[in-house]
Swiss-Prot record:
Expression by tissue: Expressed in developing seeds and in the young roots and cotyledons of germinating seeds and young seedlings.
Functional description taken from the UniProt entry: Sulfur-rich seed storage protein that remains undegraded at germination.
Species annotation: Lupinus albus
Main location: secreted
Site location (Cleavage): 296-297
Gene Ontology terms describing biological process: proteolysis
Sequence ranges assigned to domain Peptidase A1 in this UniProt record: 63-428
Uses described in the biotechnology field: May be used in antidiabetic therapies and diets for type 2 diabetes (T2D).
Record keywords: Allergen, Disulfide bond, Glycoprotein, Secreted, Signal
Glycosylation site residues: 133
Entry-linked Pfam families: TAXi_C, TAXi_N
One GO MF term: aspartic-type endopeptidase activity
Identification of the protein by name: Gamma conglutin 2
Stored CDD domains: xylanase_inhibitor_I_like (cd05489)
Length: 448
């Protein structure tokens, strides 16, 4: 017996050593969901707030971000699309990643992405990212040109910054982030230079925030602060921004105490709307002549009333009936001698040198007359040409889908919070400038 034990003891020792190595390896792998590409963080400390820096594109007025994807991680520039259903990028050229996967048709991932069709690739004789057979087909669209096409549902690593007190924390990873490899023609028009596709934040199963909420167990809330200046960053925060223990928003009491809120309505397509019952210019009500109740009525899902919040229109678009009266009331409160020929796409422009008397106040009145969003001078006017300032609102014609489509110029330098748990949208009643702040200086975005 002793002899037999002596013979098998080396095998037991080897087995125990291998088991220890396997347990250690498994422990390390379990931590990889919250792994910083530069340094290791513990899996026991799940992030409560995530940060994505955002920049303005000077040529289009739209906003974009660098997301970190693939293995090894690399920066991928994408357009911010508040109402988009998912992230899509073009994978036809230069997509290199050791962790790319294309889920099989009718798989769990397909169901999660609401993909009910199979994808067959005809572009290439060999398989590559974005080109496999018997995978999931997902419809993607360019939010600027409205072109659309089927692509391949894919999954790969995505990394995003966490926070550590008032500073940026380590990057954390989602190992199987779902997105679409879309046809390359979708990215050829309308998008800022070098952008590879849009990053969707709409109310949809595989939009960015919903995958982050699910993966990290975050509070279902995200905040957006878009910078007016191409040389400085704004940011989107995912998670509980009101948790003062996070302390990430500098002087958060000053920034957040000024917030007012109104119900958040979501269309069947997952787009974000808020009710605007009235527009006031220097306290004068803007009342459409042909339909006085246009702003205060709600039309349901067939034609959503109110204001759609977007990040893919640089300027706010108004239904013609509203635009006509709004510009007339605004012009009545401006010096007539300052008005000049309009510069497209705007309908009302002025000689900047003759505007020393100030700009009329414009307020959007929400469900309650106490809930008012005051649009600052900088958010109202656009420097269309040298020496020419225009009212930054565009005539949308008679057949708009909704009365108001809020554009990025009016949203810049405001904190806008989408509280999906309480179905409400919150915003500063006055721009951050009234507090002496900007989107760039209320966040620490160093080394982002």
């Amino acid at each position: 017996m002793a002899k037999n034990m002596a013979q098998i003891f080396p095998f037991i020792a080897v087995f125990l050593s291998c088991s220890f190595i396997f347990v250690l390896s498994s422990s390390q792998n379990s931590q990889s969901l919250y792994h910083n590409p530069q340094s290791t963080s513990s899996s026991s400390s799940k992030p409560s707030l995530l940060v994505l820096p955002i920049q303005q594109d000077a040529s289009t007025g739209l906003h974009w971000a660098n997301i970190h994807k693939r293995t090894p991680l690399m920066q991928v520039p994408v357009l911010l699309d508040l109402n988009g259903k998912h992230l899509w990028v073009t994978c036809s050229y230069h997509y290199s990643s050791s962790t790319y996967q294309a889920p099989f048709c009718h798989s769990t991932q397909c169901s999660r992405a609401n993909s009910h069709h199979c994808f067959t690739c005809t572009d290439s004789a060999t398989s590559r990212p974005g080109c496999h057979n018997n995978t999931c087909a997902l419809m993607s669209s360019n939010p600027v040109t409205q072109e659309a096409g089927f692509g391949e549902l894919a999954q790969d690593v995505l990394a995003i910054h966490s926070t550590h007190g008032s500073k940026l924390g380590p990057m954390v990873r989602v190992l199987q982030y779902l997105f679409s490899c879309a046809p390359s023609f979708l990215a050829q028009k309308g998008l800022p230079n070098n952008v590879q596709g849009p990053l969707g934040l709409g109310h949809a199963p595989i939009s960015l925030q919903n995958q982050l909420f699910s993966h990290f167990g975050l509070k279902r809330q995200f905040a957006m602060c878009l910078s007016r200046y191409p040389t400085s960053n704004g940011a989107i925060l995912f998670g509980d921004i009101y948790d003062l223990d996070n302390n990430y928003i500098h002087n958060s009491i000053d920034v957040l105490i000024d917030m007012v809120y109104t119900p958040l309505r979501i269309s069947q397509q997952g787009e974000y709307f808020m009710q605007v019952n009235a527009i006031r210019v220097n306290k004068h009500m803007v009342v459409p002549t042909k339909n006085p109740s246009m702003l205060s009525s709600y039309h349901g899902d067939s034609r959503i009333g109110g204001a759609m919040i977007t990040t893919t229109n640089p300027y706010t678009i108004l239904h013609h009936s509203i635009f006509e009266v709004f510009t007339q009331v605004f012009a009545n409160n401006m010096p007539k001698e300052a008005q000049v020929e309009s510069v497209g796409p705007f309908g009302l422009c002025y000689d900047s040198r003759k505007l020393s008397g100030g700009i009329p106040s414009v307020e959007f009145v929400m469900d309650s007359h106490d809930d008012v969003w005051r649009i600052s001078d900088e958010n109202l006017m656009v420097q269309a040409q040298n020496g020419v300032s225009c009212l930054g609102f565009v005539d949308g014609g008679m057949h708009t889908r909704t009365e108001i489509v809020l554009g990025t110029h009016q949203l810049e330098e405001n904190m806008v919070v989408f509280d999906l748990e309480r179905s409400r949208v919150e915003f500063n009643s006055n721009s951050l400038k009234s507090h002496g702040k900007t989107c760039a200086n209320i966040f620490d975005l160093n080394n982002a």
